[in-house]
């Protein structure tokens, strides 16, 4: 692993806390031009474990938000997960689960789970899906089937929620590792531009 003392980045305690500080600083500035409260919900990716999140939410730059954490260990071989940080004054978690991404033609495939969190945002039911789709490692076209499979999983989660309630409010957030015009987004997530001139 690159982020260990023996790894390529020669990771150590000082670098770790510097990174925590940098991320906390960015979070502390999000949305400040709109509201002094900052974000009520925040989907995060590349999470190694819950301790990292606990260190992050305790950082002095964001500790006053009293962020709570939704995190479950997933199936990624490197131990990299998705998580949700939320302000308990604005968001109440009702249920959550991690949903494994599989490849039918590759039983050994392991990637980040998709995190589904259902809750009340300012009293209104909302469903949040935090994703970190497979990277483009090995080239965009070679890795495309993995992102398409991730898109199919995300879409199936959305469809399931909207089957239960056609007016369900669903937000998908995270790192898609793809472009808005990529097949995973256009053809499988059915994303399109509603802002046509």
List each model region and its residues.
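N-terminal, active-site-proximal structural segment of metallo-dependent hydrolase catalytic domains
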Residues: 1-66, 70-80, 151-152
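Active-site His/acidic residue clusters
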Residues: 2-3, 124, 129-143
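Flexible glycine/proline-enriched surface loops and loop-helix/loop-strand junctions
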Residues: 7-8, 113, 136-139
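A Trp-anchored, charged/polar loop motif used as the substrate-binding/catalytic surface
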Residues: 21-27, 108-118, 152-159
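Loop/turn elements at helix/coil->beta-strand transitions in domains of secreted/extracellular proteins
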Residues: 37-41, 64-67, 122-126, 165-170, ...
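Active-site flanking residues adjacent to catalytic metal/cofactor-binding acidic residues
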Residues: 45, 131, 174-175
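Metal-dependent phosphoesterases centered on the DNase I-like endonuclease/exonuclease/phosphatase
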Residues: 147-197
């Amino acid at each position: 692993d690159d982020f260990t003392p023996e790894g390529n980045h020669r990771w150590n305690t000082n670098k770790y806390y510097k990174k925590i500080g940098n991320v906390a600083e960015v979070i502390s500035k999000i949305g400040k031009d709109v509201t002094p409260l900052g974000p009520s919900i925040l989907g995060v990716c590349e999470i190694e474990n819950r301790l990292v999140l606990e260190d992050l939410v305790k950082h002095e730059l964001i500790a006053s938000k009293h962020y709570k954490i939704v995190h479950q260990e997933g199936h990624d071989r490197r131990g990299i997960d998705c998580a949700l940080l939320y302000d308990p004054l604005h968001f109440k978690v009702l249920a959550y689960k991690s949903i494994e991404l599989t490849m039918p033609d590759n039983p050994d495939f392991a990637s980040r789970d998709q995190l589904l969190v259902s809750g009340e945002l300012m009293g209104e039911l909302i469903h949040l899906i935090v994703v970190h789709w497979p990277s483009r490692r090995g080239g965009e076209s070679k890795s495309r089937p993995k992102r398409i499979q991730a898109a199919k999983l995300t879409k199936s989660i959305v469809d399931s929620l909207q089957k239960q309630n056609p007016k369900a409010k669903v937000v998908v957030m995270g790192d898609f590792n793809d472009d808005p015009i990529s097949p995973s987004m256009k053809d499988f997530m059915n994303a399109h531009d509603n802002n046509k001139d």
